[in-house]
């Protein structure tokens, strides 16, 4: 399903883009942080840039505030080779901000400023349908499902992409502080579950969505549905597990000195989508899929070695050097 003009097919990422404020030192509370580094982020935007860094073709669809941060973020997308044609600017709401506490092990805790932020106010009639219809893969999360009108815009975009023949890719990217309750988060994340053909969840998200205290095959397969082509469970420093209709298995991690896990999952997803957009047969060939997932694990690992998501997303050459060294 390659693009007719010989260039790579388009992957469209839908959802939020925001500014993360990350403490200059790890292992302190937000109150005790001596200062913060401003880092662009937002999972769907991270995925789009991850794809572009690896040589893929990506576009982002979402809404930013018509403010300095919003225009800065749109500029960062363009600088990284991501099409910004699908971006709207809201004159009445600000670009979202998140303060991210880095624990000493590189894991994170979040405090969000979105009341409401521009991304929440994207309306169905503002969608750039031409961009969405051009997608061979349409990728999204669940944060855009939390409130209207963005929820309706999300559902419309999914429907349009699917009708145009796109592969639907879903990474729930659970951020509980943004939801009114745990129950609502679980309900809404699962409300669109059976639409996606590729789904990636973390081990923690797997336990949250199933109510299980185990991360095993039985728990993962309880989330399987008939439209799925690939279900992935990322295990952080333990690698990942994969499930298809015909086979299942696990791929070992790369061991690196993790500084900040922000964006690692997005980097993983970007690498996967980059490799399957023009070659969906990979999803039915276990040996080739394992190769792709090894590369995706390498991308995730490299991303943890620097602070912030977007600055840490690797290039193809960085990934190849890690692969060759292992």
From Swiss-Prot:
GO molecular function: ATP binding; fructokinase activity
One Pfam family here: PfkB
Keywords noted in UniProt: ATP-binding, Carbohydrate metabolism, Kinase, Nucleotide-binding, Transferase
GO BP annotations listed: fructose metabolic process; starch biosynthetic process
Pathway(s) per entry: Glycan biosynthesis; starch biosynthesis
Gene Ontology CC entries for this record: cytosol
EC numbers for this chain: 2.7.1.4
InterPro entries assigned to the protein according to its UniProt record, in alphabetical order: Carboh/pur_kinase_PfkB_CS, PfkB_Carbo_kinase, PfkB_dom, Ribo/fructo_kinase, Ribokinase-like
Family matches, as SUPFAM superfamilies: Ribokinase-like (SSF53613)
Function of the molecule: May play an important role in maintaining the flux of carbon towards starch formation.
Family: Belongs to the carbohydrate kinase PfkB family.
Protein name: Probable fructokinase-4
Phylogenetic placement of the source organism: Eukaryota, Viridiplantae, Streptophyta, Embryophyta, Tracheophyta
């Amino acid at each position: 399903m390659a693009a007719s003009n010989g260039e790579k097919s388009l992957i469209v990422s839908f959802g939020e883009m925001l500014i993360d404020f990350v403490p200059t030192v790890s292992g302190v509370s937000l109150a005790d942080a001596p200062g913060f580094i401003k880092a662009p982020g937002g999972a769907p935007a991270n995925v789009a840039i991850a794809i572009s860094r690896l040589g893929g073709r990506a576009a982002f669809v979402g809404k930013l505030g018509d403010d300095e941060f919003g225009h800065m973020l749109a500029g960062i997308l363009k600088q990284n080779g991501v099409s910004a044609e699908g971006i709207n600017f809201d004159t009445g709401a600000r670009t979202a901000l998140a303060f991210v506490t880095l624990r000493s092990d590189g894991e994170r805790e979040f405090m969000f400023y979105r009341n409401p932020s521009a991304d929440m106010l994207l309306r169905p009639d503002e969608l750039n349908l031409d961009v969405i219809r051009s997608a061979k893969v349409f990728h999204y999360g669940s944060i855009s499902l939390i409130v209207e009108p963005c929820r309706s815009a999300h559902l419309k975009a999914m429907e349009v992409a699917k009708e145009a023949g796109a592969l639907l890719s879903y990474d729930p990217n659970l951020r509980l502080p943004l939801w009114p309750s745990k129950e609502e988060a679980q309900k809404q994340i699962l409300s669109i579950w059976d639409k996606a053909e590729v789904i990636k969840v973390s081990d923690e998200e797997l336990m949250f969505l199933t109510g299980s205290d185990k991360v095993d095959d039985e728990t993962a397969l309880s989330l399987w549905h008939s439209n799925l082509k690939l279900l992935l469970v990322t295990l952080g420093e333990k690698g990942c597990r994969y499930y298809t209709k015909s086979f299942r298995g696990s791929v070992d991690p790369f061991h690196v000195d993790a500084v900040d896990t922000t964006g690692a999952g997005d980097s993983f997803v970007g690498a996967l989508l980059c490799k399957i957009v023009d070659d969906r047969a990979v999803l039915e060939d276990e040996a080739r899929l394992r190769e792709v997932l090894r590369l995706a694990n390498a991308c995730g690992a490299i991303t943890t070695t620097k602070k912030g998501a977007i600055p840490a997303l690797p290039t193809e050459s960085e990934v190849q050097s890690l692969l060759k060294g292992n």
